[in-house]
Amino acid sequence: MLLALAFAAAASTVTPSDLHVDRLQPGTATYLVYFHGAPGSGISRAMLATSTLSRERIDGQDAWVIEQHWENETGVAHTARTVHAADDLATLSQVSTWIRPDATITTRVVPAEGRGTIEGELPADRRERMEKGFATMDDGWWFNWHSDLALLPLLPYERGGTLRVHLFDVGMDAPKDVDYTVLGERTLVAGDGSTRYDCWLVETESGSPGSGNYQRFWIDKARRVVVKEEDVFNGQYRSKVLLGVPAVVEFALPASTPAAP
């Protein structure tokens, strides 16, 4: 108990002024996302998650906009457009859609007004939880969990130790504090044998200590980018690996030619 209290006291709270917002750059990145068990057990539910970050002027306010597009073997699985204030990355608005075989759910939120809407069929308890969370969005600054791949690298990992971040994502009933601990350093080498990623290795239990569930991130120090993520939950892994170039189609498919009679 005393050890747990000492560990909690050692956490350093992250405020908007601590974020390395100046390191954000417009661009597009794609992650391969897949689920798997032990090595050799096979993979499942593979997806390509592409995010485009751009600087825009939204309703007269300088903003960073993150467009997400997730695609699996059946088509589009998820899209999101999140608008962040350019100075402190507060969430100004977000539209998010999840497409599943049994339902399509779209949420729209305006955090400063504590307002959100849900389109699509949801179990009553999940809808109630989401609507409860909407009302808490205007209660101070929070970090948008949905934008973590783009924004997590901006945390002050150079401090070392444990960083405490006030987080929220649509679906939660309220923002909560989540601890990210710098476990050490790792170097990843790309397939060309020469490109090196000198990374912080960062771990979190996603605000549920003792659950046995973890997220671990390899965050490149120089580039401030997530190179790899390994999540452990329910006895399996979910991995995300940054591709060397974004998976974006450059040339359109040729028009189909009618079959000869």
Predicted regions located by residue number:
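Short non-domain terminal segments
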Residues: 5, 33, 132-135, 139-143, ...
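Acidic, serine/threonine-rich low-complexity disordered tracts
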Residues: 12-114, 161-261
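Sec-dependent N-terminal signal peptides
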Residues: 1-10
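Surface-exposed beta-loop interaction hotspot
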Residues: 114-164
